[in-house]
Amino acid sequence: MATETIAMDWVDIGTNGESRLAYLARPVVTGRLPAVIVMPAIHGINTYIKDVAIDLAKAGFVALLIDIHSPEQEPDLSNAEKIQIAVETLDDRKVLKDVDAAVRYLEQHAAVRADRLGILGFCVGGTYALLAARTPAIRVSVGFYGLLEYQSRTDNKPVSPLDSVAQFTAPILFHVGDKDPWIDSKMLAEFTKRMQQHQKSYELCIYRGAGHAFHEHFRDAYRPIAAQSAWNNTLIYLRWHLCGKRTV
């Protein structure tokens, strides 16, 4: 699908008079299409994550990219310590309410099949993609290297993905590198154990030699082979669960 057939625009998905910005990318075609909510990493909406939304649109999906920092200003991300503070400051309940708002927006959009909604996220957005797998309207969830467990429970982080496995209703595809310092083999083993214990549908893809953020082409962590493989797997998974197709 050529770039010129993709419509891109900022939209407001807010409710009850509250503004919430999101970035919409969709193929310009007749008929209704499946849609994917995109959750960015802590860096928020940048060129990289817009490219992800556009790539989804080129693949035949309506993509709605949530601004996890809206309506507040973007946080200071100038060093690792401040990035960690920004992650800890994000209120999970607020972000998941934004996911609910995105679901309602897409269900009412003329270009969207309301019964074919998925979610995709990266890093902290990958964590939110997993937490949103509890949402009945979400039919599939794909997470790239999202944190599976929290070091502690706080008002902002009351429930981790591991805590939520029993409530998952969507099938899960999870991508992670075997060199990721935030997601070790013990955490993955516990995730697998709980998914199997609760008989949840999932696929776990581990990429040798890849660390955290291996899909993000603007970072030193980028690994092109792992990134392309993970993206191909993502399209296969989304198309199977949202379109009933077995091929990319």
Curated annotation (Swiss-Prot):
Catalytic site positions: C123, D180, H212
Family the UniProt entry places it in: Belongs to the dienelactone hydrolase family.
Domain of life per record: Bacteria
The enzyme's E.C. designation: 3.1.1.91
Reactions mediated catalytically: 2-oxo-3-(5-oxofuran-2-ylidene)propanoate + H2O = 3-maleylpyruvate + H(+)
Swiss-Prot/TrEMBL keywords: Hydrolase
Keyword Hydrolase recorded: yes
Enzyme class: hydrolase
Summary of the function given for this chain in its UniProt record: Involved in the 5-nitroanthranilic acid (5NAA) degradation. Catalyzes the hydrolysis of the lactone to produce maleylpyruvate biodegradation of 5-nitroanthranilate.
Species classification: Bacteria, Pseudomonadati, Pseudomonadota, Alphaproteobacteria, Hyphomicrobiales
S-S pairs: none
Hydrolase recorded as keyword: yes
GO molecular function, one term: 2-oxo-3-(5-oxofuran-2-ylidene)propanoate lactonase activity
Protein's name according to its UniProt entry: Probable 2-oxo-3-(5-oxofuran-2-ylidene)propanoate lactonase
Organism the protein comes from: Bradyrhizobium sp
Gene3D superfamilies from the UniProt entry: alpha/beta hydrolase (3.40.50.1820)
Entries under Pfam families matching the protein: DLH
